[in-house]
Curated annotation (Swiss-Prot):
Protein's recorded name: Succinate--CoA ligase [ADP-forming] subunit beta
NCBIfam families documented for this protein: PRK00696.1, sucCoAbeta
Function in brief: Succinyl-CoA synthetase functions in the citric acid cycle (TCA), coupling the hydrolysis of succinyl-CoA to the synthesis of either ATP or GTP and thus represents the only step of substrate-level phosphorylation in the TCA. The beta subunit provides nucleotide specificity of the enzyme and binds the substrate succinate, while the binding sites for coenzyme A and phosphate are found in the alpha subunit.
Lineage: Bacteria, Bacillati, Bacillota, Bacilli, Bacillales
Origin species: Staphylococcus aureus (strain MRSA252)
Gene: sucC
Protein residues bound to Mg(2+): N199, D213
């Protein structure tokens, strides 16, 4: 689950992570009133959407004038902002964050992530702040420093100071930076985050260390422990199909291809998408039906996939372990009938009760193309979509 920058900064502030003063506004008039409350000489007007790259896309404005705060607010509110993370369709700006400006001395990058190679939380930092960390990693990887964190001990003060020294935080601000990083790590752990990222972290002319940005992603599996976090969810920022999928315990992510995918298991889903790409196709989605799919769940999965008007064919790739192939087959048959499917459909089943599942599909009399392997299924659906 993602949240807005201003919500992230409220969490930071409540847990001892230093941030500039700021207020959220939903109208141009409110933006001016919130700016007045800051009692600052410099104002930063920031578009609030669930995507990075806002500054480069024109979604961040700096001014010393209250009248310009109003002008910028009117310009941004209601505008569709397109960044490298939104896709070409962009996202509509429905709220702004009005923040006090600060005398920036230097910009840095810091982030806590889960390193899948070590299965531990890792602190990443660089003195190349304000730019995409992926670019830094590609062009100057030697400028990224990492600290692997022992889950029993947590982030140690010496690790925080070492990172501060490595990214050339001024000596007079090293202790403040270490305190900042320790507080930020506490946010990551206490709120069950999957990512906590600040780009940029800045040092100021006064020697302060502040978070000028706040990106927080939460582990969806732990949200039951954080009712306060769930209340921050902005459904308007999410794909309606993803929202509908979550209601049925389906993991769905929309992509920009034309071949719908329904798979059980995240690993198999990614392998399926890679195989489709390998044979010249483009997946329209990631959809993990999980290990406990019912007939009803399969039907909902089909409806969600078909909610994407770009879909020209569907590939179902199921390995029946906990999930039995005959149950899936029955669900597929019911779903095809209920949604009156006219698009090409390829189904590959393997595992528990696979022969019974194949018989159910064959006896249905429906236009369902069987496949014995994932590769065969991917080839078939790519061919059928291209011929359609």
């Amino acid at each position: 689950m993602n949240i807005h920058e201003y919500q992230g900064k409220e969490i930071f502030r409540s847990m001892g992570v230093a941030v500039p003063e700021g207020r959220v506004a939903f109208t141009a008039e409110e933006a001016v009133e919130k700016a007045k409350e800051l009692n600052s000489d410099v104002y930063v007007v920031k578009a609030q959407i669930h995507a990075g790259g806002r500054g480069k896309a024109g979604g961040v404005k700096i001014t010393k004038s209250l009248s310009e705060v109003e002008t910028y607010a009117k310009e941004l509110l209601g505008k569709t902002l397109v960044t490298h993370q939104t896709g070409p369709e962009g996202k509509e700006i429905k709220r702004l964050y009005i923040e006090e400006g600060c005398a920036i001395q230097k910009e840095y990058y810091v982030g806590f992530v889960i390193d899948r190679a070590t299965d531990q939380v890792t602190l990443m930092a660089s003195e190349e702040g304000g730019t995409e960390i992926e670019e830094v990693a590609a062009k100057t990887p030697e400028k990224i420093f990492k600290e692997t964190i022992d889950p029993v001990i947590g982030l140690s003060p010496f690790q925080a100071r070492r990172i501060a020294f490595n990214i050339n935080i001024p000596k007079e601000s090293v202790n403040k930076a270490a305190k900042f990083l320790l507080a930020l790590y506490n946010v990551f752990i206490e709120k069950d985050c999957s990512i906590v990222e600040i780009n940029p972290l800045v040092t100021t002319a006064d020697g302060d260390v502040l978070a000028l940005d706040a990106k927080i992603n939460f582990d969806d599996n732990a949200l039951f422990r954080h009712k306060d976090v769930v209340e921050l969810r902005d459904l308007e920022e999410e794909d309606p199909k993803e929202i509908e999928a979550s209601k049925h315990d389906l993991s769905y992510i929309a992509l920009d291809g034309d071949i719908g995918c329904m798979v059980n298991g995240a690993g198999l889903a990614m392998a399926t998408m890679d195989t489709i790409n390998h044979f010249g196709g483009n997946p329209a989605n990631f959809l993990d039906a999980g290990g406990s799919a019912t007939r009803e769940k399969v039907t909902e999965a089909f409806k969600i996939i078909l909610g994407d008007e770009n879909v020209k064919g569907i590939f179902v790739n199921i390995f029946g372990g906990i999930m039995k192939c005959d149950v899936i087959a029955e669900g597929i048959v019911e779903a095809v009938k209920e949604v009156d499917l006219t698009l090409p459909l390829v189904v590959r089943l393997e595992g528990t009760n696979v022969e019974l599942g194949k018989k159910i599909l064959k006896d249905s009399g429906l236009a369902i193309e069987p496949a014995a392997t994932m590769a065969e299924g991917a080839q078939k659906i790519v061919k059928l979509v291209k011929e359609a």
